[in-house]
């Protein structure tokens, strides 16, 4: 696969992204308030030096998107990003539906969650798989969540390059796959512009305490679809 193949696939995905019809129900925005970041007490966004006390700038955003392709039709994509959250982490979590029928009594699976594959991008690059396993021993059937974990740092002595190290190296080598093309940028803004325009009519974002995982709006957004955010 060469850089042009990767660019073509990224363009296909961006072209197939569909926004929710009800942006009020399937987007959330927030602005961090005072709280704790680790062991340090921190001020809220509006109290930061140089920030307009009436600023409506978001420091948190969450949205549901759909990808209108044969492979991903009907699969919701939930994206969230923010500042001053519980910790600094980037990951992709593929959470599977529970089977419509489990061949066990409900008491045997009451502690069983949904299977998931989590791709950790940073800071601890790796992959975690979560699935159900029978608790050994005993005469009764009990199934609980267990995890299998792979980490690059634990499996290899070589360290992965930092994000900007890789970008700078690609610039020197003239290798462009990680850089968005003009078309990719245009398609990205076609997704974001309607959301920004809608949010501009809402006034002040909902505050959330520093060190938490975002505003209550984001929790309610997923709850409407019968889901909840995964805690990294």
Which positions does each model-derived feature cover?
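Secretory/organelle targeting and membrane-embedding segments
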Residues: 4-232
């Amino acid at each position: 696969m060469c850089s042009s193949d990767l660019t073509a696939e990224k363009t296909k995905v961006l072209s197939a992204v569909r926004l929710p019809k009800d942006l009020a129900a399937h987007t959330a925005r927030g602005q961090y308030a005072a709280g704790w970041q680790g062991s340090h007490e921190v001020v809220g966004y509006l109290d930061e030096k140089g920030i307009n006390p009436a600023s409506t700038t978001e420091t948190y955003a969450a949205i549901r998107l759909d990808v209108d392709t044969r492979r991903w039709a009907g699969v919701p994509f939930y994206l969230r990003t923010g500042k001053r959250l519980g910790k600094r982490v980037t990951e992709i979590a593929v959470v599977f539906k529970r089977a419509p029928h489990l061949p066990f009594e409900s008491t045997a699976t009451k502690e069983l969650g949904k299977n998931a594959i989590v791709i950790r991008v940073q800071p601890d690059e790796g992959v975690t798989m979560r699935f159900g396993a029978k608790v050994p021993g005993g005469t009764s059937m009990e199934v609980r969540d267990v995890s299998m974990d792979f980490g690059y740092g634990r499996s290899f002595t070589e360290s992965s390059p930092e994000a900007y190290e890789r970008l700078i190296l690609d610039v020197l080598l003239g290798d462009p796959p990680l850089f968005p093309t003009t078309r990719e940028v245009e398609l990205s803004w076609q997704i974001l512009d309607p959301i920004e325009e809608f949010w501009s009519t809402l006034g002040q974002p909902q505050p959330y305490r520093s060190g938490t995982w975002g505003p209550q709006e984001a929790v309610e957004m997923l709850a409407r679809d019968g889901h909840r955010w995964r805690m990294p």
